[in-house]
């Protein structure tokens, strides 16, 4: 893909402007008050983001299409810790990260550049290991809950496309998973705002009490698609994929995404999914396959007639 810096920045402007608009202007000369601000009411499930406006009101008219790509199981430092932006690694005088984790035997394991494109020992991401790694907020349990490979990281040489994009576009260095758990609980959160209390990849017996976001889209006439390579996220609630369920019509193979992007027919919202057996970056997959997949998706979006009014989010 050949895009210059001006094109990159132009594409990122819509997303960046949303952040700036939300922050507003800061003044050091304005009036002050000792009166504490009125606390905002606690948001409840099903509450509206703009309570004074009808449900489904468009508050971002500059953006007509939102494309979401959700990859697998890598931390900010693991992928972007050395790009020089955001809250990444602290680097010593030798240019290497200073981060360490104890191994449980009195030794410190230092962060190191992965010698291969695959984390072959499979850094654990289950509920128990995740909370052991979190270690009450100290993040000192990654090695003892998995192996020393948990301290491995990748660089621009390993992930040229990912790091190249992160060097230009806005990045979220304080974005955390909804549940310190495996894939399916977090994908349930993505489409329904809950994991139904499940902490593993088992299938729930019940549907989410407030439904999934796609049902709200249909209710308000907002177009959507779940474009999948090997399995759709909608399948974390199997009944939605059953023949006759209206949501099953919103699921399409990945080839349809590329066709829709090229034709300028992207829906208002779409989830674009990797092959979970090859290009999702799940351990022990070769991460370069994931980097290539992301390159293909971004290239398709940026080449689309829809691009001037599109926001792409990947995590």
List each model region and its residues.
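N-terminal pro-sequences and low-complexity stem/linker regions of secreted or lumenal proteins
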Residues: 2, 9-19, 24-315
